[in-house]
């Protein structure tokens, strides 16, 4: 079976045109969290975006300090903060050699009417991290479990 873990979180989403070509942008963003004593849970990024997932309870009291530090250190075009998120890690050694695993996960979530807010799969293909609303967490776990454990395709 595939182990499933989660973590309640807030995400801090930053956007800056051509962020990927600016040396040190990611380090400066993470510096703002480090300077405020906040560790990050997950950091997916794209060409123009970077999202930092942190534990909501660690972040709430320091939000304004972190946002001010990000503006000062990295000067992003935009910062957006969303709370009450849950991260689910679908993990398994067999994922790398099994076709359709991601499709089965997202089909199960769609059939359960769960909106996926974030997807990240590393090149190792050993896990897929999925972000959903905290209120959808239990139903998401149930849908994924049912797809992989109860339904044998």
Could you describe each region identified by the protein language model?
Residues 1-13:
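Single conserved hydrophobic/aromatic residue that forms the stacking wall/gate
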Residues 10-153:
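A conserved regulatory-domain signal marking ACT and ACT-like small-molecule sensing domains
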């Amino acid at each position: 079976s595939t182990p499933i873990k989660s973590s309640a979180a807030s995400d801090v989403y930053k956007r800056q045109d051509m962020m990927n070509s600016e040396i040190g942008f990611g380090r400066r963003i993470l510096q703002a969290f480090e300077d405020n004593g906040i560790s990050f849970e997950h950091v997916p990024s794209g060409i123009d975006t970077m999202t930092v997932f942190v534990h909501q309870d660690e972040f709430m009291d320091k939000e304004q300090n972190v946002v001010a530090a990000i503006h000062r250190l990295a000067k992003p075009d935009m910062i957006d903060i969303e709370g009450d998120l849950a991260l689910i890690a679908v993990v398994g050694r067999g994922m790398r050699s099994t076709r359709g695993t991601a499709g089965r996960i997202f089909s199960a979530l769609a059939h359960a009417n769960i909106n996926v807010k974030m997807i990240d799969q590393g090149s190792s293909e050993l896990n897929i991290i999925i972000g959903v609303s905290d209120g959808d967490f239990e139903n998401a776990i149930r849908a994924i479990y049912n797809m992989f454990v109860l339904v044998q395709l």
